[in-house]
Amino acid sequence: GAPGLEITLAGPTLKFNTAAVIALTGAEIPATLDGLPIPMWQPIPIKAGATLKIGTVSGAGARAYLAVRGGFDVPLYLGSASTFTLGKFGGHGGRVLMPGDILHIAGSYAAAPPAITGPAPLATPLRPAMAHRWDIGVLYGPHGAPDFFTPE
């Protein structure tokens, strides 16, 4: 897949300097495009100059995802576009995004073929169920650094 943004609990406000197509998925999160609410789970065309404001996750889940046609143009590290902030590599300079950062969209929106049909939402039965209770396994790995876990 193409690099996108993982949004934990609260989202950013993004100004698009070029036309794009986005989709917002994952945990339920309100979003507006130039002040008008937009739905999740479907392609949304964005005009150059538009402002996308992503709110705070509500309900089950902690993460939402913003996909952009073509993906974000970030360097790959070991084949991944993910950011690892503790290691200071990957993603956008190996750090969290800050106000004023500019993310470039990879590929060319203009070169993308026209859609055969209009944007269609992902059918509800195909969307993942968001549970309020999770059983998870934990394995020691790079995130096992003292910054994340202590013996207590």
What are these regions (language model features)?
Residues 1-152:
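Conserved "landmark" site that anchors the functional core of diverse proteins
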